[in-house]
Every structure is written in structure tokens, then in C-alpha cells.
């Protein structure tokens, strides 16, 4: 097909406009990514206090035998590292929560202790972090200055923990005779996943460009909100709503893995 002279002149005039629009879009993406993650909504909108507190209690009970001796620690260290990261996310959510609770003034100290527990080089360091976490859990520490949302742990370990918790949630929340009985436990899992997603907004994968950084923020926010929706559906004992929310969580995970990063 041959273009007329008028059409050729029109195309030539439009090229600078197209390039200018592309430049504006790129500049907007760069500015938005440089500004950091968007402000988080109130924590109560995606992570109920009761779920977070119950998860803290669950982790304390689980960690106690693992940290009872050096031998037990060596056997359970790999699992402890992952669980300490999800505990960190729950504690940061409690620290920043918009509702009052027993750990409101101590969750920040516990967050730091959980982070140290996850990265402890040996049993002695793990014990020191564990003692600090327990003291704060008993209310024996002073409050730390207000923290900001930040990553829960090293990305590779956090992603493995997300995969583990997500798989457990999918299996446990299937419609059937056991749905109602396991709803509270599964709601806690969904809430912890929501907290991990919010923390992950602050940990953009290395080498991510400006446009994909914005996409990362959006995917993390969507994951947070969908897991919060899943938790609410489970608390309501609504199997259909739970299944629908989990299907969208699955789509989010696929978009994250395929579009931004590949799990090792």
C-alpha cells in the first residue's frame, strides 16, 4: 500500500508527539518508583489484631522446644529462619496497627528480636534474640520509636515461606466437612500472608526497572488485599467467597512469578 504525501506528512508530525508521550510516561514511572511504596491502608483493613496475636502465640509455642537446646536448634534452624520472618511481618503489623492490643508498645522490640532470630549465626545468638523476644512478649521492655513498613526478611527465604503458607492455606481451606473447623487457623494464615505482602512492597527485587517497580508495588498491594479478603471470608465461614478469593490470590502469584521474577 502506498501512502499519499499528505499521509506521510501527518505521520512525520505525529512521531514527535508519540515520543513525547512515551517520555512523559517513563518520567512518571521513574518518579513514582523513586518515591517508594504507596502509603499502606489501616492495618485493620487487612490484618485483624486477633489473627496476628494468635499467630504470635503460635510461634512462641513452636519456637520454645526448638530453642531449648543447641541440638534441637541445629535440627530446627532451617524452619525457624522462615517462621521467624513471617513472625516478623506479624509483629510489624501489630506495631503499626491502628487498633489497641496487648503488644502495642512491645511489638517493635519483638520485631527486631525476631529479625535477629532469623539471621542468628549460632545457638548463642539465637538464644539472645529469643530471650529479648520473650521479655518483650511479657511486657518487660520499653517501646521503640515508631517503625516504618520494611521487609520481613531476606527475599529468597520470605518467598519460600510465602509458598509454604500459601500451599497450606489452599489445602486447609478447601470446601468440605472440615472447612468450618479449620476456618480460624486458615484465617490466621491468610492474615500473615497479607502482612508479608505489605512488608514485601519495601523489598523490590534487585535490577527491577521503574515500570516493573510500580508493578511490584501493585502486585504486593493486591496480594495484601486479597489475603485480607480471604481471611474475612474464612472468619465468616463462607466457603464460596473463600474459594473465589483464593483463586484470585493464585492469579496474583502467577503474575508475580511470570512477570517480575522466577523463584529459585
Predicted regions and their residues:
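N-terminal secretory signal peptides that target proteins for export/translocation
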Residues: 1-12
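Intrinsic disorder/low-complexity segments in short proteins, especially the signal peptide
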Residues: 8, 22-24, 33
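Hydrophobic alpha-helical context, especially transmembrane and signal-peptide helices
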Residues: 13-14, 228
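Bacterial N-terminal signal peptides
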Residues: 15-27
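Boundary at the C-terminal end of the N-terminal hydrophobic targeting segment
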Residues: 29-35
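Mature extracytoplasmic or organellar-lumen-exposed domains after removal of signal/transit peptides
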Residues: 35-264
Amino acid at each position: 500500500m502506498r501512502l499519499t504525501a499528505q499521509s506521510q506528512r501527518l505521520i512525520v508530525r505525529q512521531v514527535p508527539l508519540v515520543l513525547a508521550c512515551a517520555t512523559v510516561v517513563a518520567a512518571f514511572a521513574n518518579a513514582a518508583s523513586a518515591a517508594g511504596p504507596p502509603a499502606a491502608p489501616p492495618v485493620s483493613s487487612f490484618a485483624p489484631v486477633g489473627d496476628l496475636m494468635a499467630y504470635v502465640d503460635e510461634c512462641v509455642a513452636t519456637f520454645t522446644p526448638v530453642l531449648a537446646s543447641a541440638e534441637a536448634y541445629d535440627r530446627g534452624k532451617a524452619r525457624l529462619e522462615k517462621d521467624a520472618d513471617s513472625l516478623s511481618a506479624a509483629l510489624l503489623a501489630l506495631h503499626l496497627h491502628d487498633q489497641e492490643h496487648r503488644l502495642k508498645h512491645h511489638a517493635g522490640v519483638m520485631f527486631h528480636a525476631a529479625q535477629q532470630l532469623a539471621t542468628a549465626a549460632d545457638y548463642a545468638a539465637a538464644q539472645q534474640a529469643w530471650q529479648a523476644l520473650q521479655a518483650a512478649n511479657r511486657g518487660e521492655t520499653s517501646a521503640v520509636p515508631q517503625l516504618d513498613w520494611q521487609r520481613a526478611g531476606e527475599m529468597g527465604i520470605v518467598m519460600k515461606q510465602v509458598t509454604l503458607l500459601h500451599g497450606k492455606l489452599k489445602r486447609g481451606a478447601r470446601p468440605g466437612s472440615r472447612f468450618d473447623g479449620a476456618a480460624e487457623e486458615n484465617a490466621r494464615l491468610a492474615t500473615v500472608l497479607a502482612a508479608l505482602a505489605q512488608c514485601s512492597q519495601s523489598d523490590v527485587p534487585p535490577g527491577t526497572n521503574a515500570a516493573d517497580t510500580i508493578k511490584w508495588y501493585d502486585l504486593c498491594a493486591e496480594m495484601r488485599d486479597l489475603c485480607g479478603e480471604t481471611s474475612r471470608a474464612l472468619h465468616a465461614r463462607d466457603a464460596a467467597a473463600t474459594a473465589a478469593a483464593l483463586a484470585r490470590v493464585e492469579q496474583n502469584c502467577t503474575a508475580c512469578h511470570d512477570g517480575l521474577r522466577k523463584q529459585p
